[in-house]
Amino acid sequence: MGTKGLPLYPDPCRAPGTKTQNTLASDSLAREGPSSNSSFHSSEEEGTDLEGDMLDCSGSRPLLESEEEDENCRPLQEKLGEAALFSESGVCTEPEERGQGGKKSQFLPINQRASDDLGEPDVFATAPFRSSLVPADDVDIFSKAPFVSKGSVAPSQMDEVDVFSRAPFTKKRSMEEFLAVQGSSQDLPMQANLSQSNEGPLLAGRDRAIYTPAQAQYPMTGFAPQAGLPSHSVQVADHFDGNSPRGSPMSSGGHPVDRNRGLQPQKEAFSGPAAGKPFHPQALSKYSRHYSPEDELSAEAQPIAAYKIVSQSNKQLLAGSVSVTSLSSRTTELATADPFALAPFPSKAGKQKP
């Protein structure tokens, strides 16, 4: 159909038949190059091809008729191609815009997407992370945590009892404890005065306490004065007791000291069932390494009294009896037998100077 009275195909290159032939010829030339079998070249062109490419005065190759036709038809083809590309690009841009619109819809805020839905609950609203737009009535999930957040700390919680005050270290004393300590410090001088006034009875009780374990350690049956003991042994004990510091009639506290106070437990022990049995230390001599049968023969020897001071504070006397012959026999045996003579090293007395 013509436009503005022009013929349908004014130009032979615009005809569809010639157009297809020209395109086929250009494609074959582009692939195979000029050859002798081509129907578009004459014998003269074949001769010139064999001789070499002939150049014009400008240095460029002269154009052939087929190439001129191709150049005439090429602008139209380019226009048609551009139009087709434009139409295709227009068609393609619409889906791209639609795709971009879909992508933009994906990046919408969560709350806006939730509002666009038909009343469906937003699953991300209950997620542990928070969105950028948090509603005002949102519940703080950290308020139920075991730790206390800084913003929700109440002033009443800051006044809690200090847990370190109950610990054994760095204990803080309250006012009541401080007053109690002051009261106890005031009572100390009063107790000191009372202790000074009662020094005599306290010392007497201390002597009794010291004498009691001594009495338990050494039974009174062994130290009781028996009928076999001479009278001068008891007199020596009384004389030694009279010369002791305890013999003063008045103590430091002003109380009189009873001389027979330490002898009262002895008198009580005299009335025991073992008071009638005499004590013979010679019976224990057989367990000694210096035992000899001569000790049994000298059992009739006269015993003497021996004294032992238990402590410096009470000056109590404990009497015992040992035989004189046993002591003499022991000393003579020890003097005659030298224990160092049997030692592996020689003694100094045994060495003779050359």
Swiss-Prot record:
Region (Disordered): 1-74, 87-115, 182-208, 235-298
Sites bearing N6-acetyllysine, chain numbering: 19
Compositional bias of kind Acidic residues: 45-54
Superkingdom in the source lineage: Eukaryota
Comp. bias intervals (Low complexity): 32-41
Positions with biased composition (Polar residues): 182-199
Phosphoserine found at: 115, 174, 292
Keywords: Acetylation, Phosphoprotein
Modified-residue entries (Phosphotyrosine), positions: 291
Protein name per Swiss-Prot or TrEMBL: Uncharacterized protein FLJ45252 homolog
Organism: Mus musculus (Mouse)
